[in-house]
Amino acid sequence: MSEPQAPKKRAACDRCRTQKLRCLRVPDHPTDSCIRCARSRMECITSSSKRPGRPRNPNNARPQQSDPGPATCAETNPPLPAVDIPVQSLGTVDDWFNFGSLETDYEICSVPWDSVDSGFPMEGVTAAHSISSLSTPPPLVPSTTPTFLNTLATDTSVDEQFENEKCAQNEAEMLQPFGDNIDHGLHLSLLQRELSKQLFALNSMPWDMTKVMRITCLHDAEASASQVDSKYNSLAKIAKTSAEFAQLLCSIQTPIAGDGGSNVSKNASPLSSIHPRLSMADLLTILSCYMLTLSIYDSIFSRFTEQASHNPGAVNVVLQSAPKLYLGGIAVPPRLEMLSHLLCCLTSRQLRPIEMLLGLPDEYCIAWKRNGGSKEKQSGLFSGQSGQLLFSTLMRVETERAGEEKGGLGVIESLKETIRRIYEFD
């Protein structure tokens, strides 16, 4: 039998064929090199032509592949299976705010209060819960998909939406304090992350005044529909989160069983005199949550004043759809000042318990003012001398470092000024 013919070489070398150029051979060259390879002093390689299609007799090729050599074992191994990553797992705001994967210190000294990563400087502080209390919680905590992203995902199935709502419900349940054995650092970090997501969503998503500021009645026939839309309402979400914040502060101030109330040693640090169960990181996270709450309310009030000034049509829609109110049998006319006063009263009702539990100075409060003539002992978290000094010092440092941006005091003054403007609406 005649030996099989060797495959013919290509006319062009590999280099010219890759660049899709005409390959011109140098006459009488010892290695039959082309002009370009000879000028660049590179080896001119011309691979053999590969026949398209399948081999003529694949059965004959199988015995040859039964005993592969060690050099070809790696080539004959099957490729690894592809990993399917669900799209919805990459569309959550938790993935955007995954600060725990950065492996760096949580630098918050130069970050303004109204930013998403608001917090306090942590240099030179030995905390029991470490810096992780100011960032995202451990990966065992289930991440949630915010509701405003679910409204955008129109192609999401019903089962996927149910799973997202179930995860959100699980995280909301973790925010509920249970007894004295809860991890306050974990709950505070969850609360801080939830407030950060709400502020980000409020500043990045469109704001519909006809839905956010809609006035409804308990006996209204459409009350059930309004309750369904409440989870997409920024005002309803911050009201619920503020109530959870106040409940968490109340559980923190609950006396510890077996403490006796006054078992603080003389050599105890000022931090232990504020609260023995909280680290410095926890106190800073509490102040960060308070400033984030004020920033959210300030953003809502700013949106309301902007809509009331430049979009009177939306205000008329809200007032016309409001139920009829009667005072002493006299119908109350629906006007803009009534809507603005209701918003201010609702905000004061949400902020008052938080400010009382924190025990902040009057200049840092929006709704609660300390009674100067009362001699009762203040029971707020920062009502003591050490707490007042710590709070004032941190606020002053943050205001100075913020520069032109709104620091902690700037957020408070901005919200106070916006409330004054709303009261002047006519």
Curated annotation (Swiss-Prot):
Name assigned to this protein: Transcriptional regulator calC
One of the record's GO molecular function terms: DNA binding
Induction (record text): Expression is induced in complex medium (Czapek yeast autolysate medium) supporting calbistrin production.
Protein role: Transcription activator that specifically regulates the expression of the gene cluster that mediates the biosynthesis of calbistrins and related compounds such as decumbenones. Calbistrin A is a secondary metabolite with an interesting structure that was recently found to have bioactivity against leukemia cells. It consists of two polyketides linked by an ester bond: a bicyclic decalin containing polyketide and a linear 12 carbon dioic acid structure.
Gene behind the chain: calC
InterPro entries (alphabetical): Zn2-C6_fun-type_DNA-bd_sf (IPR036864), Zn2Cys6_DnaBD (IPR001138)
Disruption phenotype: Abolishes the production of calbistrin and of the related metabolites decumbenones, whereas production of unrelated compounds, such as andrastin C, remains unaffected. Results in a significant down-regulation of the expression of the calbistrin biosynthesis cluster genes calA, calB and calF.
Signal peptide range: none
Stretches for region Disordered: 46-82
Entry-linked SMART domains: GAL4 (SM00066)
Any single Pfam family the record assigns to this protein: Zn_clus
Main localization category: nucleus
Biotechnology: applications noted: Calbistrin A has been reported to possess a number of interesting bioactivities including antifungal active against Candida albicans and cytotoxic toward both healthy and leukemic human cells.
Record's subcellular location: Nucleus
Keyword annotations from UniProtKB, A to Z: DNA-binding, Metal-binding, Nucleus, Transcription, Transcription regulation, Zinc
GO CC, any one term: nucleus
DNA-binding region: 13-44
